[in-house]
């Protein structure tokens, strides 16, 4: 992306909510990540080249602010800030894992965003992530454990809002003749 001239990267992800106040349908503009993945390439560097990139603030505040303002303008229920737990998958969490992630104060859980957030930082790209809550993972006693059917049902409901977000964010972009 950097080689093609991209400066900003927006990620849209389906996630499980790890807090009762993040019901399905909520969009979360996350600002932190915990990487629990293990089977993915995690760096552009290697083969004798070492680089240490700070991940203290993995989300670009400028893009995060723009995303938040755009979602608010579209009337989408949103929360600004939160911690995204990236798990390897493809299996969903066990109840014990879900409880542990909640005890870590994670807000949402998903299988994407890592290594993307780290790679964007390495490439010096402005990165932001919108997590679209589709379920309560398996921790919530009043809700069934997550299923693919439930995720797809909520995602279909979020699709128009996600398209509206991307359209609104990219509308000001122009190309040089």
Functional labels for PLM-detected ranges:
Residues 1-139, 145, 149-156, 160, ...:
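Glycine-rich phosphate- or other oxyanion-binding loops that anchor nucleotides, phosphorylated ligands
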């Amino acid at each position: 992306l950097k080689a093609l001239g991209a400066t900003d990267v927006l990620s849209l992800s389906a996630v499980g909510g790890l807090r009762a106040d993040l019901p399905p349908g909520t969009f979360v503009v996350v600002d932190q990540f915990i990487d629990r993945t293990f089977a993915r390439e995690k760096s552009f560097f290697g083969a004798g080249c070492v680089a240490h990139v700070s991940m203290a603030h993995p989300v670009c505040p400028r893009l995060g602010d723009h995303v938040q303002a755009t979602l608010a303008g579209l009337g989408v229920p949103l929360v600004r800030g939160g911690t995204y737990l990236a798990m390897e998958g493809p299996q969903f969490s066990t109840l014990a894992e879900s409880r542990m992630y909640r005890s870590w104060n994670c807000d949402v859980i998903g299988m994407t965003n890592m290594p993307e957030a780290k790679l964007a930082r390495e490439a010096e790209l402005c990165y932001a992530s919108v997590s679209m809550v589709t379920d309560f993972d398996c921790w919530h006693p009043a809700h069934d454990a997550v299923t693919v059917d439930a995720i797809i049902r909520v995602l279909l409901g979020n699709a128009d809002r996600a398209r509206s977000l991307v359209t609104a964010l990219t509308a000001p972009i122009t190309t040089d003749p």
